[in-house]
């Protein structure tokens, strides 16, 4: 059975593309839809784990990522 791990995906629209970013590994990908961007990010993360050395994985891995929203007065 393959080992699995849960990662965060932050997806933003940029022009006609959707950019997906994984903050735990600082890896990003893109797609023409949210679904495609998410799929491409999953592929990029899987490829990273297939080819990166254990030390590179340890250096890039952020163990704690907090995603939150804030209310800021703007005017």
What is each stretch, according to the model?
Residues 5-22:
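Short aromatic-glycine-(Arg/Gly/Cys) micro-motifs in beta-strand/loop hairpins
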Residues 25-34:
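A short, exposed loop/beta-hairpin motif centered on an aromatic-Gly-Thr core
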Residues 15, 25-26, 56-57:
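Amphipathic alpha-helical interaction segments
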Residues 1-10, 39-75:
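Short, charged, surface-exposed hinge/linker loops at domain edges
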């Amino acid at each position: 059975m393959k080992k699995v791990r849960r990662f965060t995906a932050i997806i933003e629209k940029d022009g006609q593309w959707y950019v997906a970013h994984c903050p735990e590994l600082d890896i990003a990908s893109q797609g023409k839809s949210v679904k495609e961007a998410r799929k491409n990010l999953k592929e990029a993360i899987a490829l990273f784990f297939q080819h990166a050395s254990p030390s590179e994985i340890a250096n890039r891995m952020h163990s704690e990522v907090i995603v939150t929203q804030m209310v800021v007065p703007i005017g």
